[in-house]
C-alpha cells in the first residue's frame, strides 16, 4: 500500500531487547584437579620481535610512505655487504612485520614453537612471503627464540580496475614451528618444598574440596586452602626430589567443583549462558506488543476540462491499533533454570526478549545469580 508507515510500540512489563540464542550449561559431576587448577609459576611467556617479510608479489609496503621499512631494508642489506645508501629503492616485495609467539613452560633449547606474523605498514597481502631471521625478545629484553620461514595465510585479496574482493585478513599469517627456542627459563620444580595450585575459577568451596581430596588420598594433611584461588601442597617426604611423580598422582584426583550462580549475556551477539544453580524467587512476568499502523492514501481531485480549476491533492489517513494478547505469568519461589525457561516460553516470549527480561527480573531482586554483561 503506498504511503504506509509502520510504528511499532513494544510494551514489556519487565523489559524487551534482543537475544539470538539461549544456551544452558551444566557442569559435569566431577573434574580432575588438573582441569580445575594450574601449578603456580608454570605458565607461558609472551615473545615479540620486529622483522621483514620478502618475496611478496608487489603487495608489500610502499617504501616512500613507510620509512621504517626502507630503513630496515637498507640496514639488512648493509649487513649482507650491500651498500645502497642514497640509492633509490623501488620494490613492493618487502613488508615490515611484528612477530609474536608464546614460549611454552619448560621449553628446552632446540625445540620449536609457532609464531604469528602481522603487517606493520601498508602492505596489502602477505601471501607467498618469507619471514627473514627475526629474534624474539621477552619482557626482560633477552632473546629467547629466533623465527624464520614461509608464511601461511588464511585470507586473500583480489582486485581489478574497478572491483576488489577481500576474504579474511591477508595481512596476518602464521608459521607453524617457525621459531627455534634458544634460551630456557630456569624453573627448579624438584627443589620446591611446596607447590601451590592456582584455581582457574576462584571459589572457596572448590578450594576446600581439592584440599580434602588430596589429604584423603595421601592419608595425611598435606594440602591446605590458602584463599579461594590457591591451595598449597606440602611435598611429602617420600616424594622429596621427585615432585613430578607427586603432581602426576595429585592431578588425576576427581573433585566436584562448586559453581557460583551466574548468567553471562553477550548483547552484541545476543547469546545468554546460564549456570546450573540459577534460582528465581517469586515474580510476575508479563510481555505484550502493541502495533500501530498508519496508512496514507492521498486523494487527487481533477478539475473539469477547459475549466479554470486546479488539481488538488487531499490527504487521507487511517490509523489502526493491534495488541497481541499476552498473559501474566507467576514464577514461583525457588524454580530451577529449566522451569524458568519453560515459563518464559509459555508466555510466547522468543529469544529476542530473553536478555532484557532476565535483566528486569534481576533488577526486581527476584533472581539469585550474578548477571555479567559482556
Swiss-Prot record:
Gene Ontology CC entries for this record: bacterial-type flagellum basal body, distal rod, P ring; outer membrane-bounded periplasmic space
Main location: periplasm
Cited InterPro entries: Flag_FlgI
Domain of life: Bacteria
Record GO terms (molecular function): structural molecule activity
GO biological process: bacterial-type flagellum-dependent cell motility
Region forming the signal peptide: 1-29
Subcellular location: Periplasm; Bacterial flagellum basal body
Keywords (A to Z) from UniProt: Bacterial flagellum, Periplasm, Signal
Pfam family, one: FlgI
Family: Belongs to the FlgI family.
HAMAP family recorded: FlgI
Record function comment: Assembles around the rod to form the L-ring and probably protects the motor/basal body from shearing forces during rotation.
Description of how the protein assembles with itself and partners: The basal body constitutes a major portion of the flagellar organelle and consists of four rings (L,P,S, and M) mounted on a central rod.
Protein name as it appears in the record: Flagellar P-ring protein 1
Gene coding for it: flgI1
Amino acid at each position: 500500500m503506498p504511503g504506509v508507515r509502520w510504528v511499532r510500540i513494544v510494551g514489556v512489563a519487565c523489559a524487551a531487547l534482543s537475544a539470538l540464542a539461549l544456551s544452558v550449561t551444566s557442569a559435569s559431576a566431577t573434574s580432575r584437579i588438573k582441569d580445575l587448577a594450574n601449578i603456580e609459576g608454570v605458565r607461558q611467556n609472551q615473545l615479540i620481535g620486529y622483522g621483514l617479510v620478502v618475496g611478496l608479489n608487489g603487495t608489500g609496503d610502499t617504501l616512500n610512505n613507510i620509512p621504517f621499512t626502507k630503513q630496515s631494508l637498507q640496514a639488512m642489506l648493509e649487513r649482507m655487504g650491500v651498500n645502497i645508501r642514497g640509492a633509490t629503492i623501488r620494490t613492493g616485495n618487502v613488508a615490515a612485520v611484528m612477530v609474536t609467539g608464546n614460549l611454552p613452560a619448560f621449553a628446552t633449547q632446540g625445540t620449536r614453537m609457532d609464531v604469528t606474523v602481522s603487517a606493520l605498514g601498508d602492505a596489502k597481502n602477505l601471501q607467498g612471503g618469507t619471514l627473514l631471521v627475526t629474534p624474539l625478545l621477552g619482557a626482560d629484553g633477552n632473546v629467547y627464540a629466533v623465527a624464520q620461514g614461509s608464511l601461511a595465510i588464511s585470507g586473500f585479496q583480489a582486485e581489478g580496475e574497478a572491483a576488489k574482493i577481500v576474504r579474511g585478513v591477508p595481512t596476518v599469517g602464521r608459521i607453524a614451528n617457525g621459531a627455534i627456542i634458544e634460551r630456557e627459563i630456569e624453573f627448579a620444580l624438584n627443589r620446591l618444598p611446596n607447590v601451590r595450585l592456582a584455581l582457574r575459577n576462584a571459589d572457596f568451596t572448590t578450594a576446600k574440596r581439592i584440599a580434602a581430596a588430596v589429604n584423603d588420598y595421601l592419608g595425611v594433611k598435606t594440602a591446605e586452602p590458602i584463599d579461594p584461588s590457591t591451595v598449597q601442597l606440602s611435598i611429602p617426604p617420600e616424594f622429596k626430589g621427585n615432585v613430578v611423580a607427586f603432581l602426576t598422582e595429585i592431578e588425576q584426583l576427581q573433585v566436584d567443583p562448586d559453581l557460583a550462580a551466574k548468567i553471562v549475556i553477550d548483547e552484541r551477539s545476543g547469546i545468554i549462558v546460564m549456570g546450573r544453580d540459577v534460582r528465581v524467587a517469586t515474580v510476575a512476568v508479563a510481555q505484550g506488543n502493541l502495533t500501530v499502523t498508519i496508512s496514507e492514501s492521498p486523494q487527487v481531485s481533477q478539475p473539469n476540462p477547459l475549466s479554470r480549476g486546479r488539481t488538488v491533492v487531499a490527504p487521507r489517513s487511517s490509523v489502526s491499533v493491534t495488541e497481541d494478547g499476552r498473559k501474566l505469568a507467576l514464577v514461583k519461589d525457588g524454580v530451577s533454570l529449566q522451569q524458568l525457561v519453560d515459563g518464559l516460553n509459555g508466555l510466547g516470549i522468543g529469544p529476542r526478549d530473553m536478555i532484557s527480561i532476565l535483566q528486569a527480573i534481576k533488577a526486581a531482586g527476584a533472581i539469585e545469580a550474578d548477571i555479567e554483561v559482556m
